[in-house]
Swiss-Prot record:
It is found in: Cytoplasm. Belongs to the class I-like SAM-binding methyltransferase superfamily. TPMT family. It is an enzyme of class 2 (transferase). Its EC number is 2.1.1.67. One of its GO terms (molecular function) is thiopurine S-methyltransferase activity. PANTHER family: THIOPURINE S-METHYLTRANSFERASE. This is Thiopurine S-methyltransferase. Keywords: Cytoplasm, Methyltransferase, S-adenosyl-L-methionine, Transferase. GO terms for cellular component: cytoplasm. The gene is tpm.
Length: 218
C-alpha cells in the first residue's frame, strides 16, 4: 500500500477509519498498564485521533507519527491548540507542551525520538496494513520501542474475503505468530462489534470482532 493511497484518502476526506469518539477499549483498559503520569507514550499512524487527547489528559507525553500533513494539521485545528512546527530530519515536527507529532514515514522515523518511550498505543496502525506489509510494520514498531515498553493493541478481525480493507482483518493467530518474538502478549478482551459498524453490515460481513491486547516489549 503506497503513501499516495493515504494522501488521497485524507485529501478526499474519505476517513471512515477515523473515530469520532475515544476508543472504549482505551478508556477501559489503559489503566491496566499501571503507568506514571509523566510517561512518554508512542502512537504510531496516529492520524487525528482523539485518543491522543485522552492520553494527554492522563498526564502522559504523547509522541505520534503520521504520514499525512493534513491529518496532523486537522488534529491541532480540531482541538484548538496552537502548535510549533520545526523540521527534524525527514520529518516535520508539530508540538505543544504535551503532544509531539512527527509527520512523515514511520519507516524512517529516527529511533532517538522514541528512546525515552515506555508505553505505546496502537489502535489504527496494525490494521491499516495489508497482510503483505503488516509484518514489516510490526518489526519496525518493535525496533522503535525500548525493551520493557508496555502497550495497548486494538485489532479488528472479520472474514477478509467479505470486505476489502482498510481496516484489514488481523486474527489472534496472526498476532501470536508475528508479534510473539518481540512482545509478551496478553489478551484483555474480544467482543462482537458488528452492530456498531454500518459499513460492515452494508457489505453483509457476517461477523466483526474487536480485540484488545496488552503487549510488553521483550
Amino acid at each position: 500500500m503506497e503513501p499516495g493511497f493515504w494522501h488521497e484518502k485524507w485529501h478526499q476526506q474519505q476517513i471512515g477509519f477515523h473515530q469520532q469518539d475515544i476508543n472504549p477499549f482505551l478508556v477501559k483498559y489503559w489503566q491496566k498498564l499501571g503507568l506514571p503520569a509523566d510517561t512518554q507514550v508512542f502512537v504510531p499512524l496516529c492520524g487525528k485521533s482523539l485518543d491522543m487527547c485522552f492520553l494527554a489528559e492522563q498526564g502522559h507525553q504523547v509522541i505520534g507519527c503520521e504520514l499525512n500533513e493534513l491529518a496532523v494539521q486537522q488534529f491541532f485545528s480540531d482541538i484548538q491548540l496552537e502548535m510549533t512546527q520545526t523540521t527534524v530530519g525527514e520529518h516535520q515536527h508539530y508540538h505543544t507542551e504535551q503532544i509531539s507529532l512527527y509527520q512523515g514515514d514511520i519507516f524512517t522515523l529516527p529511533k532517538a525520538i522514541t528512546q525515552e518511550v515506555t508505553a505505546f498505543y496502537d489502535r489504527a496502525a496494525l490494521i491499516a496494513w495489508p497482510e503483505c506489509m503488516r509484518a514489516q510494520y510490526a518489526k519496525q514498531l518493535a525496533s522503535l520501542l525500548p525493551s520493557g515498553s508496555v502497550g495497548l493493541l486494538v485489532t479488528l478481525d472479520y472474514p477478509q474475503e467479505a470486505l476489502s480493507g482498510p481496516p484489514f482483518a488481523v486474527s489472534p493467530t496472526w498476532v501470536e505468530q508475528h508479534l510473539s518474538d518481540d512482545f509478551d502478549i496478553g489478551v484483555l478482551a474480544s467482543q462482537d462489534v458488528l452492530a456498531d459498524n454500518p459499513r460492515f453490515i452494508k457489505k453483509a460481513v457476517p461477523w466483526l470482532n474487536e480485540a484488545a491486547y496488552l503487549l510488553k516489549r521483550k
